[in-house]
Each structure stands twice: as C-alpha cells, then as structure tokens.
C-alpha cells in the first residue's frame, strides 16, 4: 500500500543529486529560503501553492514532455516537542497523453546543492523507494521542481492498481511552477480538517 513502509527517502534523494543533508545547512540561510518559499515567516502551519498549466505553444516546443499540468503544495509545520519544523509536499499532475489526475507526496528537508554556489533547496522523497524531487526558488513568484523519478498514484483508485513512475526525460527534468492562491491546491488535500484549515488561510 501507498504508506505501508517508511524509508530513508530524503537521504536517498540527497545521495542521487549530490547534495549535503540538513545537518550541514546554515540555519540563517534555511530561514531565508523558507521566507522565499512560503512568502513570509513561518507560523504553526504554513502552506505554499505553485501551479502550472502548459499551453499548446510550450508543449509544441517541448514535444517529449510527458506532463501537461502540475500543482505543488508545500507544508511547513512547527513541531515544538521536537524543536524542529517538519516539511512535506504534495504533487498533482496530468499526463499529456493519458487521462486522469495523478498524485504523489512525501517528506522534505533542507539540503545544499553542490556546484550551485551553496544554493539551498528542499530535498523531498516518497516512501518505499519511490524516488522524489528537489525544490528550489527561481524567484519570489516561481519555484523549480527537479526530478529523476517519482512514484505517483492515480487519484481515487486503489493503490495497487494505480501506481506509476514519472521518469525524467529530455523535457521532464525541471519544471517551473508559479505561486498561486492556496485554494488552487485544495484538491491535493484529502484530510477534512486540514482542508478546512487550508481554506481559511
């Protein structure tokens, strides 16, 4: 099942992409990254939503791109008992030549990307060796999603029957997504209490 096992997913993503894990991240730089990602200082639970719908012109210029639309919801939740902040992501997208909505999710931590002048990113992984993504800020209004492979599930279908892998290709390695109102990402949330909280942000 989708959440049946827990693996060291962030560590695996860090290894694949030649990055240093959270222990090596400067706290001040991580705080500055969070302010850019979430559009301000963190509260007890803070969200950021990014959306992109690729138009015909873009897809014509990227004929090998498999994805036609993408939504990203990033969450930061204060965990005072652990004296830390827990980060997670939910990713929803549509395939270009396949019907349906597909989702993935997992946990994240700060990493330092090598050969980028010490750029801070979030390294995010999916349980059970499901791959993952890296998140960076392009500017104040846009984020970049980098992936090699990420497991996803067709929405509202049994896990065992609906598992897929989105594998990076020539036009599917880096996606730019643009900041949007939180309601744009509400479809990615399944918990009723969290959905209600999101709608009141």
Short names for language-model regions:
Residues 94-152:
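Surface-exposed, polar helix/loop patches in the mature regions of secreted/periplasmic/lumenal proteins
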Residues 6-15:
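Bacterial N-terminal signal peptides
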Residues 19-67, 128-130, 138-201:
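Amphipathic/hydrophobic helical signal segments and adjacent flexible N-terminal regions
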Residues 8, 57, 79-81:
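A broad, structure-centric signal for solvent-exposed, well-ordered loop/edge residues
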Residues 1-4:
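Positively charged n-region of N-terminal signal peptides that target proteins for export
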Residues 44-51, 82-88, 118-122:
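Short, hydrophobic/aromatic-rich segments at coil-to-beta transitions
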């Amino acid at each position: 099942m989708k959440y049946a096992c827990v693996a060291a997913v962030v560590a695996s993503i860090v290894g694949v992409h030649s990055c240093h894990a959270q222990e090596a991240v400067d706290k001040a730089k991580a705080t500055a990254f969070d302010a850019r990602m979430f559009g301000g200082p963190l509260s007890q639970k803070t969200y950021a939503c990014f959306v992109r719908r690729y138009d015909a012109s873009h897809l014509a210029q990227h004929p090998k791109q498999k994805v036609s639309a993408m939504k990203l919801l990033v969450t930061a939740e204060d965990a005072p008992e652990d004296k830390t902040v827990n980060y997670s992501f939910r990713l929803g997208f549509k395939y270009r030549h396949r019907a349906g909505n597909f989702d993935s999710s997992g946990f994240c931590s700060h990493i330092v990307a090598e050969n980028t002048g010490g750029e801070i990113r979030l390294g995010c992984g999916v349980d059970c060796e499901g791959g993952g993504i890296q998140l960076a800020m392009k500017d104040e209004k846009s984020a970049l999603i980098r992936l090699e492979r990420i497991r996803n599930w067709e929405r509202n279908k049994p896990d065992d029957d609906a598992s897929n892998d989105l594998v990076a290709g020539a036009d599917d390695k880096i996606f730019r997504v643009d900041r949007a109102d939180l309601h744009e990402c509400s479809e990615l949330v399944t918990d009723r209490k969290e959905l209600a909280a999101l709608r009141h942000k």
